């Protein structure tokens, strides 16, 4: 089941979609401008409004830091353990103190209540 989203961070990183299955939660993102992108696995926070944290499993379409991929309008994915179907919102936050942090993403209070799950 997936829900379309349109959350943006600094007008550059766009959170397009969340998909939840029995085994994982998959977030689809892209950048609107040419950026050298990598995923800060260390200290990545994905949690729902109740404060439940869901551990990071893997990234797809982009490497873990420090290896950066130059991309624009190319989807990439962050995969976490399966979140509760009862969740009403979530935060996705990269650790600003992580070793390779440049402009760590912060998506807070992304609302799932308007979702039309398909």
Q: Which positions does each model-derived feature cover?
A:
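An anionic, turn-rich surface loop/hairpin at beta-sheet edges
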Residues: 55-74
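Catalytic phosphate/metal-binding cores of nucleic-acid and nucleotide-processing enzymes, i.e., regions
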Residues: 19
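Long, intrinsically disordered, low-complexity accessory segments associated with secretion
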Residues: 27-29
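Surface-exposed edge beta-strand/loop patches
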Residues: 1-10, 14, 23-25, 34-39, ...
């Amino acid at each position: 089941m997936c829900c379309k989203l349109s959350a943006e961070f600094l007008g550059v990183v766009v959170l397009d979609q969340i998909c939840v299955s029995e085994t994982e939660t998959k977030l689809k993102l892209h950048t609107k401008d040419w950026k050298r992108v990598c995923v800060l696995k260390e200290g990545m926070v994905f949690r729902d409004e109740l404060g439940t944290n869901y551990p990071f499993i893997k990234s797809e379409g982009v490497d873990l830091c420090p290896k950066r991929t130059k991309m624009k309008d190319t989807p990439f994915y962050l995969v976490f353990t399966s979140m509760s179907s009862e969740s009403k919102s979530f935060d996705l936050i990269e650790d600003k103190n992580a070793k390779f942090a440049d402009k760590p993403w912060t998506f807070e209070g992304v609302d799932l209540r308007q979702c039309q799950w398909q």
